A protein has these predicted regions:
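Helicase motor core with emphasis on the C-terminal RecA-like subdomain
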Residues: 52, 74-84, 89-168, 175-449, ...
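Extended, highly charged accessory segments
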Residues: 458-461, 465-530, 544, 588, ...
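Short, well-ordered loop/turn sites that connect or cap secondary structure elements
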Residues: 525-527, 552, 559
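Short beta-strand-centered aromatic/proline hotspots
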Residues: 565-568
Length: 878
């Protein structure tokens, strides 16, 4: 048991007995459970009794551990108690929220059957007393963006007792008078995949919706959080329960059964040499390995990191090994019907393999998976645990998986990642704090419910964990913006969204159109430019990026959903296709941002580099593995190929530079671009093992300082393992670098970075997102959807003028916060600079004729030199 501030977090390590757990359920529910399941799972031995006793509970447990049943069964039991007493009303008692519509559909199906079966037992036992005593069946319903108008009307007339929904639909419901009547008496709230929500603005949005709902309910509601890979648990618990009156965090019981399922996973290299083996042979080896795993298992799930990678793997498996309809792709750009069909077939055992990017990462029910393959690093330990954990769909089964590396740096990353999976470590997440765009959206929503006092509204907002530290001045500034108090915005058609009486200190609804505007524009997910793909018979296939379509010419062939299509023509935002006869595709590149390496994994890689690097010696005359290094590598969950490749890679770096950069030592190479004879570009290569989110900050501020000294704009190549500064033909010396590091270690880097990003495309794009969430730029006006291009144009025009209006304008301030704290990692970057200043992290500057081996991947994928994918192999060999 730990007391944190005024918040009592109780970590439970002693489960209740089976008898205590089962007697918490009523007779019919208990009999149904014992008939269906042989025993209680670890989380159920805690949860059944705790939820029955009305405690707030956070449950973390792996896929297949009965986690969902842990959250629901005590609630179902209580609702059947009400039914047996003739007191079950036509209203909502429990709201279940998840980030995925597909997960909601699963929950609906998985609850409907137990509810039917339990009620059938009651009918069998009670007979005609069912009618006499008004014993109703417990009902469940789904309310998402996919719910039809007819279903919504029926829910208003006869609301389900358990309502399954999404954060966005919940926000709509708390602004509907009819729905408020039905949900105003809820007793339970379940948040599934809580870590997935709490780490982003969808979760921030949800937290305010929950506190607004609590203000409507005016009583304690039991809160239940579910997730598979949650760390730190305190952060998730605080997000779940929030604060009560008096700024005291509510109590929460924490059930940590996250490692109750055994994982067997190995990192491997498809060949014994990832440099000198031809690309074609490496590809052949990868697909041969995948084919072997598929054939040796009843069902295999393959994860890639991109949708284009998913399409490529499906196409290659079909073309190389003759797979047909027994293999399928699953990702977010495919139609809902296609995704549901794949999920159903996989669950029924009709597919031997499904390839996915992230869409099957969370707990969608896909039945029993025997094996999981991860192609390349997942960039996160938690993500690896989540993905590998999809194998073995029961708490006693072993989750078996392989992580196949694609190059030498990827191999080190995969090896350290898998090692930490085995060591039961996770990455940490943090919740965005005081997001002013989401706040603005909810203030508008609140104004539609009633007239609010500013202090009353401020107190309510601060009950949500992400806003507990919100400054009153920022709250007032946001209300001033929404109240139309900023002069100069009218000519951009930005008008007041609420009535705000500054003297009285109150705000409320502004005009009849406010409700429509709110309902049509709420949510936190920004609009993307996507082109819908249709066949000639008007069947929707999926979507592609607009930028990709502009590159296509008539009769080009591309892959989507694991099938080939011929491009026929473009009609506005539609792409018309036909089934392709050719076997040569153009795989569509989705231009989504590449996943950044987590800070924790970056640090573990740095520690591994130091540990293995300390075993190396310049006296070593050959590449045979020394005893100390052999002992370290033998403890890693890697194959023989991986062991040999990693050691050779380290030896190459060490013999060339005498240094292995790590988490305590930054190597700075003063070198020149390879593969050019005249006008060689001068490069400064920083081997900083902190991940891209931090390296983004370090590279920008270093480039700013150096650029000012040299009077030039400096090109940056950014990676997870470091960054490269291209200074052209100019020369720097070590003293200059020392001075810059000294300056930036004590500088106000937040101010520097704001100046750096102010005119960038990144700022323009992110401001559009923030302005959309904050209702400054509408995405829909009176039912007419406003295109992304129009939104972008409107937001850029506003951004040009906003500094002159107020440099601390709430949505401008929020854009900077989102970039520096959500996209980048300002707190950790500041800590690293402090550690450099204090000497805890050291740096070494060396001159090299050519970039060292550890720099090669940065150069190749940064596109600085004229290295193409075709001659990458040759470059690395040289």
């Amino acid at each position: 048991m730990y007391a944190i501030g005024y918040f009592l977090i109780e970590y439970l390590d002693k489960p209740f007995s089976d008898e205590q757990s089962l007697t918490a359920l009523n007779l019919y529910v208990r009999n149904w459970f014992l008939d269906k399941f042989k025993e209680l799972t670890p989380p159920q031995k805690f949860a059944f009794k705790l939820i029955n006793d009305k405690f707030n509970v956070l449950i973390t447990a792996p896929t297949g551990s009965g986690k969902t049943m842990s959250g629901f069964l005590s609630i179902i039991s209580k609702l059947f108690d009400y039914a047996l007493e003739g007191k079950l009303e036509n209203r909502v008692y429990c709201i279940y929220v998840s980030p995925l519509r597909s997960l909601n559909n699963d929950i609906y199906k998985n609850l409907s059957v137990p509810l039917d079966e339990i009620y059938a037992q009651i009918i069998k036992n009670k007979g005609m007393d069912i009618i006499k005593n008004n014993i109703k069946k417990v009902s469940v319903g789904v309310r998402t963006g996919d719910t039809t108008q007819k279903e919504r009307r029926l829910q208003l007339i006869r609301p389900p007792n358990i309502l399954v929904t999404t954060p966005e639909s919940l926000a709509i419901m708390i602004n509907s008078k009819r729905f408020i009547e039905n949900i105003g008496g809820i007793e339970y709230l379940i948040i599934d995949e809580i870590h997935e929500l709490a780490s982003n603005k969808r979760g921030v949005h949800l937290s305010l919706s929950i506190e607004r709902l609590m203000a409507i309910v005016k009583k304690n509601v039991v809160r239940i959080g579910l997730g598979a890979t949650i760390y730190p648990l305190e952060e998730a618990a605080k997000f779940l329960v929030g604060y009560s009156a008096g700024n005291t965090l509510r109590e929460c019981k924490v059930i940590d059964a996250s490692w109750s399922k055994k994982l067997e996973v190995i990192a491997l290299s498809p060949v014994n040499d990832l440099v000198h083996t031809p690309n074609k042979d490496i590809d052949n080896a990868i697909y041969k390995k995948i084919d072997s795993i598929i054939k040796n298992n009843r069902s295999t799930l393959i994860f890639t990191n991109t949708r284009s990678g998913t399409e490529r793997v499906v196409f290659n498996l079909k073309s190389r090994y003759g797979y047909g309809n027994d293999i399928a792709a699953h990702h977010g750009s495919l139609s809902k019907d296609t995704r549901l069909e794949v999920e159903e077939k996989l669950k029924k055992g009709e597919l031997s393999c499904v390839v996915t990017s992230t869409s099957l990462e969370l707990g969608v029910d896909i039945g029993s998976i025997e094996n999981v393959i991860q192609l390349g690093s997942s960039k996160s330990i938690s993500r690896a645990v989540q993905r590998i954990g999809r194998a073995g769909h029961s708490f006693k089964s072993i989750a078996i998986g392989e992580v196949i590396a694609l190059d030498r740096d990827d191999l080190i990353e995969c090896s350290v990642m898998v090692d930490n999976v085995i060591k039961k470590r996770l990455d940490s997440f943090s919740t965005p704090k005081n997001a002013l765009d989401v706040l603005a959206q909810h203030i508008i929503g609140m104004s539609l419910n009633k007239k609010w006092g500013v202090d009353e509204a401020y107190d309510l907002v601060r009950k949500a964990y992400p806003y507990n530290t919100l400054d009153k001045n920022e709250f007032i500034a946001t209300i001033n913006y929404l109240g139309g108090k900023y002069l100069g915005l009218e000519h951009h058609r930005v008008y007041g969204k609420i009535w705000y009486d500054e003297k009285e200190g109150t705000f409320n609804q502004r005009g009849r159109l406010s409700q429509v505007m709110y309902m049509l524009n709420l949510g936190t997910i920004p609009d993307d430019v996507a082109i819908n793909v249709f066949t000639l018979d008007k069947k929707w296939v999926g979507s592609i990026e607009e930028e990709f379509m502009t590159k296509m010419k008539q009769h080009d062939i591309f892959a989507l959903g694991g099938k080939l299509y011929e491009f026929l023509e473009a009609k506005e935002t539609r792409c018309i296709v036909a089934a392709a006869k050719s076997l040569t595709p153009t795989i569509p590149p989705w231009f989504s941002e590449q996943l950044p390496l987590s800070f924790e994994l970056a640090q573990y890689i740095g520690e591994f580099r130091k540990k293995l690097g300390d075993t190396l010696s310049l006296k070593q005359k050959n590449k045979s593995i020394n005893k100390k290094a052999d002992a370290i590598l033998n403890l890693m969950p890697i194959d023989k190929n991986a062991k040999k490749i990693i050691y050779n890679y380290f030896i190459e770096q060490f013999l060339y530079t005498k240094i292995i950069p790590n988490n305590e030592l930054i190597l700075i190479e003063d070198t020149f671009e390879p593969n050019s004879t005249k006008n060689k570009k001068h490069l400064l290569i920083f081997h900083s093992m902190f991940g891209r989110r931090i390296n983004d900050i370090l590279s920008r501020i270093f480039a700013m300082e150096l650029g000012e000294i040299l009077d030039m704009n400096i090109d940056i190549i950014l990676s997870d393992n470091g960054f490269i500064l291209n200074i052209g033909e100019l020369i720097v010396n070590s003293q200059m670098i020392d001075e810059i590091i000294s300056n930036i270690s004590s500088a106000n880097i937040s101010t520097m970075l704001k100046h750096n990003i102010r005119k960038t495309e990144l700022m323009k794009r992110r401001f559009r997102h923030v302005a959309g969430r904050g209702f400054m730029v509408l995405r829909n006006y009176k039912g007419n959807k406003i295109g992304v291009r129009k939104q972008q144009l409107n937001s850029q025009m506003i951004l040009k003028d906003i500094d002159q209006i107020d440099k601390n304008f709430p949505l401008l301030k929020e854009t900077y916060r989102e970039i520096l704290y959500d996209l980048m990692d300002m707190p950790r970057a500041q800590q690293i600079l402090y550690d450099i200043k204090e000497g805890k992290i050291k740096y070494k500057i060396i001159k090299t004729k050519f970039p060292s081996p550890f720099a090669h991947k940065m150069l190749i994928f940064g596109g600085l030199s004229n290295i193409t994918l075709e001659n990458t192999q040759q470059y690395l060999q040289n």
